[in-house]
Amino acid sequence: GGTSGPGAPSEPGETPGETRVDSAGNITAAPELNDSGIAVTEIDDETLATALANAKETDGKKTVEITIPAIEGAKAYEISLPASALTSSAGDTRFVIKTDMAVVTLPGNMLAQEAAAKAKKVSLSITLVDVSQIEDEELRQLIGRRPIIQLSLRIDGEDFPWNNPDSPVRVAIPYTPTEEELANPEHITVWHIDRDAKVTPVPNGRYDEETGTVTFSITHFSWFAVVYVHKTFGDLAGVGWARKPIEVMASKGIIQGTGPDTFSPASNITRADYTVLLIRTLGLRAEFTDNFDDVKEDAYYYEAVGIAKKLGIALGDGDNRFNPEEPISRQDLMTLSARVLDKYMGLKLSDDIHVLDRFIDKGDIAEYALSGIATLVKEGLIVGSDSRISPLANTTRAEAAVFLYRVYNSYVK
Protein backbone atom coordinates (compact mmCIF):
# COMPACT_ATOMS: atom_id res chain seq x y z
CA GLY A 1 0.00 0.00 0.00
CA GLY A 2 0.93 3.67 -0.06
CA THR A 3 2.24 5.72 2.81
CA SER A 4 0.95 8.59 4.83
CA GLY A 5 2.30 11.94 3.68
CA PRO A 6 3.37 15.12 5.41
CA GLY A 7 1.02 17.21 7.51
CA ALA A 8 1.50 20.34 9.61
CA PRO A 9 5.27 20.94 9.84
CA SER A 10 6.79 22.22 13.05
CA GLU A 11 7.93 25.79 12.77
CA PRO A 12 11.29 26.92 14.07
CA GLY A 13 11.00 28.88 17.28
CA GLU A 14 7.81 27.15 18.56
CA THR A 15 7.84 26.98 22.34
CA PRO A 16 6.01 23.93 23.77
CA GLY A 17 2.77 25.07 25.37
CA GLU A 18 2.79 28.44 23.57
CA THR A 19 -0.45 29.52 21.88
CA ARG A 20 -0.87 32.30 19.31
CA VAL A 21 -3.95 33.77 17.59
CA ASP A 22 -3.66 35.68 14.32
CA SER A 23 -5.89 38.45 12.95
CA ALA A 24 -8.09 35.94 11.08
CA GLY A 25 -8.85 34.03 14.28
CA ASN A 26 -6.54 31.11 13.51
CA ILE A 27 -4.73 29.51 16.43
CA THR A 28 -1.27 27.93 16.49
CA ALA A 29 -0.84 25.80 19.61
CA ALA A 30 2.56 24.19 20.18
CA PRO A 31 2.09 20.89 22.03
CA GLU A 32 4.08 19.36 24.87
CA LEU A 33 5.09 15.70 24.65
CA ASN A 34 4.08 13.80 27.79
CA ASP A 35 5.63 10.59 29.18
CA SER A 36 3.15 8.46 27.21
CA GLY A 37 4.26 9.91 23.87
CA ILE A 38 1.11 12.02 23.50
CA ALA A 39 1.48 15.59 22.22
CA VAL A 40 -0.84 17.54 24.50
CA THR A 41 -2.18 21.05 23.95
CA GLU A 42 -4.93 23.09 25.58
CA ILE A 43 -6.87 26.12 24.32
CA ASP A 44 -8.17 28.29 27.15
CA ASP A 45 -11.34 30.40 27.25
CA GLU A 46 -9.56 33.66 26.50
CA THR A 47 -7.75 32.28 23.43
CA LEU A 48 -10.98 30.76 22.13
CA ALA A 49 -12.92 34.01 22.63
CA THR A 50 -10.25 36.02 20.77
CA ALA A 51 -10.20 33.50 17.91
CA LEU A 52 -14.00 33.52 17.54
CA ALA A 53 -14.07 37.33 17.62
CA ASN A 54 -11.50 37.48 14.79
CA ALA A 55 -12.79 34.51 12.76
CA LYS A 56 -14.26 35.08 9.31
CA GLU A 57 -17.51 33.57 8.12
CA THR A 58 -17.57 31.05 5.27
CA ASP A 59 -20.83 29.33 4.23
CA GLY A 60 -22.54 31.13 7.12
CA LYS A 61 -20.17 29.60 9.71
CA LYS A 62 -17.29 31.10 11.63
CA THR A 63 -14.25 28.90 11.06
CA VAL A 64 -11.35 28.71 13.51
CA GLU A 65 -8.27 26.78 12.34
CA ILE A 66 -6.18 25.30 15.14
CA THR A 67 -2.76 24.19 13.89
CA ILE A 68 -0.78 21.86 16.14
CA PRO A 69 2.81 21.79 14.83
CA ALA A 70 4.28 18.30 14.44
CA ILE A 71 6.42 17.07 17.30
CA GLU A 72 8.95 14.29 16.85
CA GLY A 73 8.14 11.02 18.56
CA ALA A 74 4.44 11.78 19.05
CA LYS A 75 2.19 8.75 18.66
CA ALA A 76 -0.97 10.80 19.29
CA TYR A 77 -2.22 14.36 19.59
CA GLU A 78 -4.66 15.46 22.27
CA ILE A 79 -6.24 18.89 22.10
CA SER A 80 -8.45 20.23 24.87
CA LEU A 81 -11.01 22.98 24.32
CA PRO A 82 -13.55 24.70 26.56
CA ALA A 83 -16.72 22.60 26.27
CA SER A 84 -18.64 25.72 25.21
CA ALA A 85 -16.82 25.51 21.84
CA LEU A 86 -18.67 22.31 20.90
CA THR A 87 -22.01 22.73 22.69
CA SER A 88 -23.45 25.59 20.66
CA SER A 89 -27.04 24.88 19.63
CA ALA A 90 -26.79 27.33 16.71
CA GLY A 91 -24.29 25.27 14.70
CA ASP A 92 -22.73 28.44 13.25
CA THR A 93 -19.10 27.69 14.18
CA ARG A 94 -16.56 25.02 13.28
CA PHE A 95 -13.06 24.20 14.44
CA VAL A 96 -10.49 22.75 12.04
CA ILE A 97 -7.87 20.82 14.05
CA LYS A 98 -4.72 20.44 11.91
CA THR A 99 -2.09 17.85 12.80
CA ASP A 100 0.34 15.84 10.69
CA MET A 101 -1.74 12.68 11.34
CA ALA A 102 -5.11 14.08 10.27
CA VAL A 103 -7.13 17.25 9.86
CA VAL A 104 -10.39 16.97 11.83
CA THR A 105 -13.22 19.50 11.42
CA LEU A 106 -15.47 19.68 14.47
CA PRO A 107 -18.88 21.38 14.16
CA GLY A 108 -19.66 23.76 17.02
CA ASN A 109 -22.86 21.84 17.79
CA MET A 110 -21.39 18.32 17.82
CA LEU A 111 -22.11 18.07 21.57
CA ALA A 112 -25.41 19.96 21.68
CA GLN A 113 -27.00 17.27 23.83
CA GLU A 114 -27.85 16.56 27.47
CA ALA A 115 -24.66 14.60 28.19
CA ALA A 116 -22.39 17.61 27.72
CA ALA A 117 -24.64 20.27 29.28
CA LYS A 118 -22.50 20.75 32.43
CA ALA A 119 -19.14 19.94 30.86
CA LYS A 120 -16.16 22.27 31.28
CA LYS A 121 -13.47 20.70 29.08
CA VAL A 122 -13.59 18.55 25.95
CA SER A 123 -10.51 16.68 24.69
CA LEU A 124 -10.10 15.24 21.18
CA SER A 125 -7.44 12.56 20.65
CA ILE A 126 -6.02 11.67 17.23
CA THR A 127 -3.90 8.52 17.41
CA LEU A 128 -1.96 6.79 14.63
CA VAL A 129 -2.68 3.07 15.11
CA ASP A 130 -0.03 0.49 14.24
CA VAL A 131 -1.46 -2.23 11.98
CA SER A 132 0.08 -4.86 14.30
CA GLN A 133 -2.64 -3.96 16.84
CA ILE A 134 -5.18 -5.68 14.57
CA GLU A 135 -5.32 -9.38 15.43
CA ASP A 136 -7.08 -10.52 12.24
CA GLU A 137 -4.23 -11.41 9.84
CA GLU A 138 -6.35 -11.12 6.68
CA LEU A 139 -7.45 -7.63 7.70
CA ARG A 140 -3.84 -6.66 8.46
CA GLN A 141 -2.83 -7.77 4.96
CA LEU A 142 -5.68 -5.83 3.34
CA ILE A 143 -4.73 -2.60 5.10
CA GLY A 144 -0.97 -3.08 4.65
CA ARG A 145 1.06 0.09 5.24
CA ARG A 146 -1.87 2.45 4.81
CA PRO A 147 -2.72 4.73 7.75
CA ILE A 148 -5.16 3.80 10.50
CA ILE A 149 -6.29 6.49 12.92
CA GLN A 150 -8.25 6.32 16.14
CA LEU A 151 -10.44 9.27 17.07
CA SER A 152 -11.75 9.55 20.61
CA LEU A 153 -13.33 12.14 22.87
CA ARG A 154 -13.15 12.79 26.59
CA ILE A 155 -15.35 15.15 28.59
CA ASP A 156 -13.80 16.41 31.82
CA GLY A 157 -11.36 13.49 31.75
CA GLU A 158 -13.98 10.76 31.19
CA ASP A 159 -14.20 8.78 27.92
CA PHE A 160 -17.27 9.86 25.97
CA PRO A 161 -18.75 7.61 23.22
CA TRP A 162 -19.60 10.46 20.85
CA ASN A 163 -22.34 9.70 18.31
CA ASN A 164 -24.38 12.47 16.67
CA PRO A 165 -26.02 11.85 13.26
CA ASP A 166 -27.01 15.54 13.05
CA SER A 167 -23.46 16.94 13.26
CA PRO A 168 -20.98 15.03 11.09
CA VAL A 169 -17.26 15.45 11.72
CA ARG A 170 -15.05 15.80 8.64
CA VAL A 171 -11.69 14.00 8.54
CA ALA A 172 -8.77 14.27 6.09
CA ILE A 173 -5.82 11.87 6.39
CA PRO A 174 -2.61 12.68 4.46
CA TYR A 175 -1.93 9.83 2.03
CA THR A 176 0.45 9.10 -0.84
CA PRO A 177 -1.07 6.43 -3.14
CA THR A 178 0.94 3.74 -4.91
CA GLU A 179 1.16 3.78 -8.73
CA GLU A 180 -1.57 1.13 -8.94
CA GLU A 181 -3.83 3.17 -6.67
CA LEU A 182 -3.19 6.40 -8.59
CA ALA A 183 -4.33 4.63 -11.76
CA ASN A 184 -7.69 3.90 -10.05
CA PRO A 185 -8.01 6.52 -7.29
CA GLU A 186 -11.77 6.04 -6.94
CA HIS A 187 -11.04 2.69 -5.30
CA ILE A 188 -9.19 4.34 -2.41
CA THR A 189 -11.74 4.39 0.39
CA VAL A 190 -12.20 4.12 4.16
CA TRP A 191 -13.24 1.37 6.56
CA HIS A 192 -14.52 1.74 10.10
CA ILE A 193 -13.04 -1.01 12.31
CA ASP A 194 -14.82 -1.83 15.57
CA ARG A 195 -13.45 -3.53 18.71
CA ASP A 196 -14.18 -7.00 17.31
CA ALA A 197 -12.24 -6.17 14.10
CA LYS A 198 -15.57 -6.03 12.25
CA VAL A 199 -15.31 -3.82 9.19
CA THR A 200 -17.96 -1.37 7.95
CA PRO A 201 -17.29 0.67 4.80
CA VAL A 202 -17.55 4.47 5.12
CA PRO A 203 -19.30 5.20 1.79
CA ASN A 204 -18.20 8.85 1.54
CA GLY A 205 -14.49 7.96 1.92
CA ARG A 206 -12.48 9.08 -1.11
CA TYR A 207 -9.05 10.27 -2.22
CA ASP A 208 -8.71 13.99 -2.94
CA GLU A 209 -5.85 14.44 -5.42
CA GLU A 210 -5.79 18.21 -4.92
CA THR A 211 -4.97 18.01 -1.22
CA GLY A 212 -3.26 14.59 -1.19
CA THR A 213 -5.62 13.38 1.51
CA VAL A 214 -8.27 10.72 2.01
CA THR A 215 -11.41 12.50 3.18
CA PHE A 216 -14.56 11.20 4.88
CA SER A 217 -17.38 12.32 7.18
CA ILE A 218 -18.42 10.41 10.30
CA THR A 219 -21.05 10.66 13.03
CA HIS A 220 -19.24 8.54 15.65
CA PHE A 221 -15.62 8.00 16.70
CA SER A 222 -13.59 4.79 16.45
CA TRP A 223 -10.77 3.35 14.30
CA PHE A 224 -10.72 4.32 10.63
CA ALA A 225 -8.39 2.80 8.02
CA VAL A 226 -7.48 3.93 4.53
CA VAL A 227 -7.95 0.94 2.18
CA TYR A 228 -7.79 0.13 -1.52
CA VAL A 229 -10.72 -2.00 -2.69
CA HIS A 230 -11.33 -3.14 -6.27
CA LYS A 231 -14.55 -5.15 -6.20
CA THR A 232 -15.79 -6.63 -9.48
CA PHE A 233 -18.33 -9.20 -10.68
CA GLY A 234 -18.21 -11.95 -13.29
CA ASP A 235 -21.37 -10.93 -15.17
CA LEU A 236 -20.52 -7.40 -16.33
CA ALA A 237 -19.30 -8.29 -19.84
CA GLY A 238 -22.51 -7.10 -21.53
CA VAL A 239 -22.65 -3.76 -19.71
CA GLY A 240 -19.30 -2.12 -20.44
CA TRP A 241 -20.96 1.31 -20.09
CA ALA A 242 -21.83 0.49 -16.46
CA ARG A 243 -18.76 -1.51 -15.38
CA LYS A 244 -16.79 1.33 -13.75
CA PRO A 245 -19.75 2.83 -11.82
CA ILE A 246 -20.76 -0.65 -10.58
CA GLU A 247 -17.20 -1.51 -9.47
CA VAL A 248 -16.60 1.85 -7.75
CA MET A 249 -19.95 1.90 -5.93
CA ALA A 250 -19.48 -1.74 -4.84
CA SER A 251 -15.92 -1.03 -3.65
CA LYS A 252 -17.22 1.82 -1.49
CA GLY A 253 -19.78 -0.50 0.11
CA ILE A 254 -22.75 1.38 -1.35
CA ILE A 255 -24.10 -1.36 -3.61
CA GLN A 256 -23.89 -5.12 -3.24
CA GLY A 257 -24.00 -7.96 -5.71
CA THR A 258 -26.76 -10.55 -5.92
CA GLY A 259 -24.12 -13.19 -5.12
CA PRO A 260 -20.37 -13.33 -4.38
CA ASP A 261 -19.50 -12.95 -8.09
CA THR A 262 -22.78 -11.79 -9.65
CA PHE A 263 -24.37 -8.36 -9.97
CA SER A 264 -27.34 -9.22 -12.25
CA PRO A 265 -27.01 -5.89 -14.09
CA ALA A 266 -30.00 -6.47 -16.38
CA SER A 267 -32.41 -7.35 -13.55
CA ASN A 268 -34.96 -4.76 -12.49
CA ILE A 269 -34.33 -2.94 -9.22
CA THR A 270 -37.20 -2.76 -6.74
CA ARG A 271 -38.56 0.38 -5.10
CA ALA A 272 -37.19 -0.77 -1.73
CA ASP A 273 -33.73 -1.64 -3.04
CA TYR A 274 -33.39 1.69 -4.81
CA THR A 275 -34.45 3.57 -1.68
CA VAL A 276 -31.79 1.70 0.34
CA LEU A 277 -29.11 2.65 -2.20
CA LEU A 278 -30.19 6.29 -2.43
CA ILE A 279 -30.21 6.75 1.36
CA ARG A 280 -26.82 4.99 1.64
CA THR A 281 -25.27 6.98 -1.22
CA LEU A 282 -26.22 10.31 0.33
CA GLY A 283 -25.66 9.22 3.94
CA LEU A 284 -29.08 10.47 5.05
CA ARG A 285 -30.25 9.90 8.62
CA ALA A 286 -33.49 10.54 10.51
CA GLU A 287 -35.28 9.30 13.61
CA PHE A 288 -38.67 7.86 12.66
CA THR A 289 -41.52 6.23 14.54
CA ASP A 290 -43.86 5.09 11.77
CA ASN A 291 -43.51 3.51 8.36
CA PHE A 292 -45.66 2.44 5.42
CA ASP A 293 -48.22 -0.28 6.19
CA ASP A 294 -46.66 -2.72 3.70
CA VAL A 295 -43.08 -2.33 5.00
CA LYS A 296 -42.50 -5.04 7.60
CA GLU A 297 -40.32 -4.31 10.62
CA ASP A 298 -38.00 -7.25 9.93
CA ALA A 299 -37.40 -6.26 6.28
CA TYR A 300 -33.79 -5.29 5.49
CA TYR A 301 -35.10 -2.09 3.90
CA TYR A 302 -37.29 -1.07 6.88
CA GLU A 303 -34.85 1.57 8.14
CA ALA A 304 -34.08 3.14 4.73
CA VAL A 305 -37.75 3.39 3.73
CA GLY A 306 -38.64 4.75 7.19
CA ILE A 307 -35.96 7.44 6.83
CA ALA A 308 -37.20 8.30 3.32
CA LYS A 309 -40.78 8.59 4.60
CA LYS A 310 -39.78 10.74 7.56
CA LEU A 311 -37.74 13.06 5.32
CA GLY A 312 -40.70 13.47 2.98
CA ILE A 313 -38.99 11.96 -0.05
CA ALA A 314 -40.90 8.65 -0.26
CA LEU A 315 -44.58 9.50 -0.53
CA GLY A 316 -46.11 6.10 -1.30
CA ASP A 317 -49.40 5.68 -3.16
CA GLY A 318 -51.62 7.85 -0.95
CA ASP A 319 -52.95 4.82 0.95
CA ASN A 320 -49.86 4.59 3.20
CA ARG A 321 -48.46 1.85 0.99
CA PHE A 322 -45.02 1.89 -0.62
CA ASN A 323 -45.17 -1.29 -2.77
CA PRO A 324 -41.55 -2.05 -1.80
CA GLU A 325 -41.11 -5.22 -3.86
CA GLU A 326 -42.41 -3.68 -7.11
CA PRO A 327 -39.87 -2.69 -9.78
CA ILE A 328 -39.29 1.07 -9.82
CA SER A 329 -40.02 2.84 -13.10
CA ARG A 330 -37.42 5.19 -14.50
CA GLN A 331 -39.69 8.20 -13.98
CA ASP A 332 -40.38 7.26 -10.35
CA LEU A 333 -36.66 6.77 -9.70
CA MET A 334 -35.94 10.19 -11.19
CA THR A 335 -38.78 11.88 -9.28
CA LEU A 336 -37.73 10.37 -5.94
CA SER A 337 -34.08 11.27 -6.57
CA ALA A 338 -34.79 14.83 -7.70
CA ARG A 339 -36.95 15.35 -4.60
CA VAL A 340 -34.18 14.25 -2.21
CA LEU A 341 -31.48 16.25 -4.03
CA ASP A 342 -33.70 19.34 -3.95
CA LYS A 343 -34.65 19.00 -0.27
CA TYR A 344 -31.31 17.99 1.21
CA MET A 345 -28.40 18.32 -1.24
CA GLY A 346 -28.72 21.81 -2.71
CA LEU A 347 -30.19 20.97 -6.12
CA LYS A 348 -32.84 23.46 -7.26
CA LEU A 349 -35.82 21.98 -9.12
CA SER A 350 -36.40 23.65 -12.48
CA ASP A 351 -39.76 24.45 -14.07
CA ASP A 352 -38.12 24.73 -17.49
CA ILE A 353 -39.15 21.50 -19.19
CA HIS A 354 -37.98 22.52 -22.68
CA VAL A 355 -34.81 20.55 -22.01
CA LEU A 356 -36.98 17.44 -22.52
CA ASP A 357 -37.84 18.39 -26.11
CA ARG A 358 -34.85 16.36 -27.36
CA PHE A 359 -36.58 13.11 -26.33
CA ILE A 360 -39.10 11.64 -28.77
CA ASP A 361 -41.03 9.96 -25.93
CA LYS A 362 -41.38 13.12 -23.83
CA GLY A 363 -45.16 12.72 -24.06
CA ASP A 364 -44.98 9.51 -22.01
CA ILE A 365 -43.74 11.36 -18.92
CA ALA A 366 -46.38 11.75 -16.20
CA GLU A 367 -47.23 15.31 -15.16
CA TYR A 368 -45.86 14.79 -11.62
CA ALA A 369 -42.48 13.69 -12.99
CA LEU A 370 -41.81 16.48 -15.53
CA SER A 371 -40.00 18.97 -13.30
CA GLY A 372 -37.80 16.37 -11.57
CA ILE A 373 -36.76 14.66 -14.80
CA ALA A 374 -36.10 18.00 -16.54
CA THR A 375 -33.87 19.08 -13.64
CA LEU A 376 -31.84 15.85 -13.68
CA VAL A 377 -31.38 16.08 -17.47
CA LYS A 378 -30.29 19.71 -17.15
CA GLU A 379 -27.75 18.71 -14.46
CA GLY A 380 -26.34 15.94 -16.67
CA LEU A 381 -27.38 13.22 -14.21
CA ILE A 382 -29.71 11.63 -16.79
CA VAL A 383 -28.78 11.43 -20.48
CA GLY A 384 -31.30 9.03 -22.00
CA SER A 385 -30.53 6.68 -24.88
CA ASP A 386 -31.24 6.90 -28.62
CA SER A 387 -33.25 10.12 -28.14
CA ARG A 388 -35.47 8.37 -25.60
CA ILE A 389 -35.92 8.93 -21.87
CA SER A 390 -38.05 5.76 -21.43
CA PRO A 391 -40.00 7.05 -18.40
CA LEU A 392 -42.35 4.06 -18.12
CA ALA A 393 -39.67 1.37 -18.42
CA ASN A 394 -38.46 -0.38 -15.30
CA THR A 395 -34.98 0.57 -14.07
CA THR A 396 -32.25 -2.06 -14.27
CA ARG A 397 -29.66 -2.54 -11.54
CA ALA A 398 -26.97 -1.33 -13.96
CA GLU A 399 -28.91 1.86 -14.77
CA ALA A 400 -29.45 2.57 -11.07
CA ALA A 401 -25.73 2.10 -10.35
CA VAL A 402 -24.69 4.50 -13.13
CA PHE A 403 -27.17 7.15 -11.98
CA LEU A 404 -26.12 6.88 -8.32
CA TYR A 405 -22.44 7.04 -9.33
CA ARG A 406 -23.14 10.39 -11.02
CA VAL A 407 -25.09 11.59 -7.97
CA TYR A 408 -22.26 10.47 -5.66
CA ASN A 409 -19.62 12.37 -7.62
CA SER A 410 -21.76 15.51 -7.87
CA TYR A 411 -23.24 15.73 -4.37
CA VAL A 412 -21.27 13.61 -1.87
CA LYS A 413 -18.25 15.50 -0.62
What annotation goes with each model-predicted range?
Residues N204-R206, I218-R243, S251, I255-A304, ...:
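Feature responds to low-complexity, polar/acidic, surface-exposed segments characteristic
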Residues G1-I43, L52:
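Ser/Thr/Gly/Pro-rich low-complexity, disordered linker/stalk segments of secreted
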Residues N34-D194:
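Proteolytic processing hotspots in large secreted/extracellular or virion-associated proteins
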Residues I66-I68, V190, M249, G253, ...:
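Terminal processing/anchoring signals of secreted or surface-associated proteins
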Residues K61-T63, A76, D92-R94, P168, ...:
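A generic structural signal for beta-strand entry/edge sites
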Residues G1-P6, T15, G25-A29, L142-K252:
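Proteolytic cleavage junctions
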